[in-house]
């Protein structure tokens, strides 16, 4: 009964936010303040468990099936440092006929890059027979003219960019790659492995700090960055289940996650590897409502930083969930 009630609240809020088309979602709140009701989801139970030491409580959670093989989760987590975090997760099972695909603007070529907001890019990528079911932002971006992603970009087997545009002022960028091989396997590796791997990668973007490698939380994450910020990251298990994370930050009530906390979440989910992507005002997750068919912005983007956020930032690359 509790799960049914939670689902009905989720559907009502989700649908009401979609009446005006693509829009920014406000964090959904529980219908009751009875703490003992939560967590209600299996993933919430995992995140509250011993495998995720940086999360001490799940204050609220819910889940919704977007399409077979794709589940959406939303949580309010309480961290070891007593920070409340609005957190969003996608669970993608490629064995159910889904795949992760890199999205770019229609105007982008290997020589000229363009940026686009996610709701527009998702609409442009969608067809009647194969809509984009979900999308998150991709790699970091070098905003100097002409703009370009920090790392390599492969889309549907075409190499749009290779190599890395690194900057000593942004040492946490241009450190890795996230890819999908031609046989559908997820892969994450450091920059030095890209050249030998690139011919095997159907989809690929660059990435930042590697959070998990071979099931181990990587050392030195505190050295890289102790700050709280909005975050986007991707991890996967040994059986190729993909977890996509977005966390709100830079506004009252949810300041953002640290690298250590992100790594702890992916470790709790049993991920073999996980990597950080672009964050800050770039962090965004959109999901297609299965009832209305409209795209919903699930999180609360932090731009503009001098206000209360809620504005999409244009990005050169994204990761989309579509049918194979």
Q: What is the meaning of each model-derived region?
A:
Residues 1-4:
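Positively charged n-region of N-terminal signal peptides that target proteins for export
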Residues 14-16:
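C-terminal motif of bacterial Sec signal peptides marking the signal peptidase cleavage site
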Residues 18-169:
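Zymogen propeptides
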Residues 76-79, 85, 89, 206-239:
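Conserved beta-alpha junction segments in alpha/beta enzyme cores
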Residues 96-97, 139-144, 194-195, 249-252, ...:
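Solvent-exposed loop/turn segments at secondary-structure junctions
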Residues 133-137, 177-179, 187-189, 233-235, ...:
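Structural recognition of the beta-strand scaffold that forms the well-ordered cores
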Residues 146-165, 220-236, 241-271, 282-324:
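Conserved, well-ordered active-site substructure
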């Amino acid at each position: 009964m509790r799960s049914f009630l939670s689902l009905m609240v989720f559907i009502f809020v989700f649908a009401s936010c979609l009446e005006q088309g693509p829009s920014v979602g406000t964090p959904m709140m529980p219908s009751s303040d009875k703490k003992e009701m939560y967590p209600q989801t299996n993933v919430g139970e995992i995140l509250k468990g011993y495998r995720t030491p940086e999360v001490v409580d799940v204050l609220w959670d819910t889940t919704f099936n977007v399409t077979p093989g794709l589940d959406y989760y939303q949580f309010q987590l309480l961290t070891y440092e007593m920070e409340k975090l609005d957190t969003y997760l996608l669970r993608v099972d490629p064995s159910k006929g889904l795949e992760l695909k890199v999205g770019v603007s229609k105007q982008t070529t290997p020589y000229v890059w363009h940026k686009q907001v996610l709701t527009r890019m998702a609409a442009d990528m969608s067809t009647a027979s194969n809509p984009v079911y979900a999308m998150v932002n991709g790699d970091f971006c070098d905003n100097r003219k002409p703009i370009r992603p920090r790392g390599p970009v492969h889309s549907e087997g075409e190499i749009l960019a290779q190599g890395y545009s690194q900057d000593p002022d942004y040492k946490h960028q241009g450190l890795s790659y996230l890819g999908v091989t031609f046989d559908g396997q997820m892969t994450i590796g450091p920059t030095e492995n890209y050249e030998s791997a690139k011919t095997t990668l159907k989809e690929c973007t660059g990435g930042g700090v590697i959070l998990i490698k071979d099931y181990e939380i990587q050392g030195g994450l505190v050295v890289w960055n102790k700050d709280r910020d909005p975050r986007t990251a991707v991890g996967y298990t040994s059986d190729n289940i993909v977890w996509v994370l977005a966390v709100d930050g830079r506004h009252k009530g949810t300041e953002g996650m640290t690298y250590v906390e992100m790594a702890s979440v992916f470790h709790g989910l049993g991920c073999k590897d996980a990597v950080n992507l672009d964050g800050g005002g770039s962090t965004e997750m959109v999901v297609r409502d299965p009832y209305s068919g409209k795209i919903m912005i699930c999180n609360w983007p932090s731009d503009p930083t001098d206000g209360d956020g809620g504005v999409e930032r244009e990005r050169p690359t994204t990761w989309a969930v579509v049918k194979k």
